[in-house]
């Protein structure tokens, strides 16, 4: 879902592609071709469609996608976007992938919760705008630029699969975090049959997340666990490769570990409460 009141069409096109390639990166596949279907209503004109397509092409180019197809179909109202991206995975990953073990590391590619806070800021400003009826004023969101940007134009490292290919590390599991960290952890628990422990003091946050959380009356930890659209990559890394991982993947944070099956999926506070 998206709200064109505050969502630039170019950013929307870009974000749709990033969200789709993220699923491929989670499984260590490289994207190679994209097929786009746009349902267009009479509410959108050619410049707007071009802006959306430019965003799609920008992201496709950034992620080294060399083939693109576009299909335009009529829509009774609004805008509908369908994107399919195909990718290729190296046999090396399948051959080297091992089952997860208790104490293996749960790692994430960047901060979480920022996108939900950014969206909440935009929704707040939209309500103010609608209440005031001021069509000339623009909200000042500069000091929240990182949070708003995390929602409107999330980014993923297009070289992540190459990094793993060059490394001796093969994750046992990988997920795109796009419906909250809690959702990804539940999927990991389900797929592995093992327990998962996350530690709240290890979860990375954007710098002013807690300040904004107070303003919006939103707990940033809850935003990280239950919010969406962060577009981060979560991998399970063998404990034996900790030193190599810390050296080769310095932008990642280790936020927890695999546990025994009877643990389930739990969040541990700094005081040790689960």
Positions of the model-derived regions?
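Helix-biased detector of long, well-ordered alpha-helical tracts
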Residues: 1-274
């Amino acid at each position: 879902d998206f709200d064109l009141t505050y969502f630039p069409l170019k950013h929307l096109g870009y974000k749709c592609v990033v969200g789709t390639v993220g699923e491929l990166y989670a499984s260590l596949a490289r994207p190679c071709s994209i097929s786009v279907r746009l349902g267009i209503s009479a509410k959108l004109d050619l410049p707007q469609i071009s802006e959306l397509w430019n965003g799609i092409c920008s992201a496709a180019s950034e992620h080294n996608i060399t083939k693109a197809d576009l299909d335009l179909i009529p829509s009774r109202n609004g805008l509908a976007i369908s994107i399919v991206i195909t990718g290729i995975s190296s046999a090396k990953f399948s051959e080297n992938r091992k089952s997860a073990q208790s104490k293996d590391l749960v790692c994430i590619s960047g901060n979480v919760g920022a996108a939900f806070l950014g969206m909440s800021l935009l929704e707040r400003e939209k309500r103010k705008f609608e209440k005031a009826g001021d069509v000339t004023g623009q909200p000042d969101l500069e000091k929240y630029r990182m949070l708003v940007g995390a929602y409107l134009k999330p980014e993923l490292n297009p070289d992540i699969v190459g990094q793993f290919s060059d490394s001796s590390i093969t994750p046992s599991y990988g997920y795109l975090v796009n419906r909250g960290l809690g959702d990804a952890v539940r999927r990991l628990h389900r797929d592995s049959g093992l327990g998962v422990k996350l530690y709240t003091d290890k979860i990375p946050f954007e710098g002013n997340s807690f300040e904004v959380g107070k303003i919006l009356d939103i707990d940033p930890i809850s935003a990280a666990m239950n919010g969406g659209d962060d577009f981060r990559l979560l991998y399970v890394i063998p404990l034996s490769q900790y030193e190599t991982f810390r050296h080769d993947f310095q932008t990642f944070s280790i936020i927890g570990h695999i546990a025994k099956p009877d643990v389930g999926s739990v969040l541990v506070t700094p005081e040790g409460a689960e």
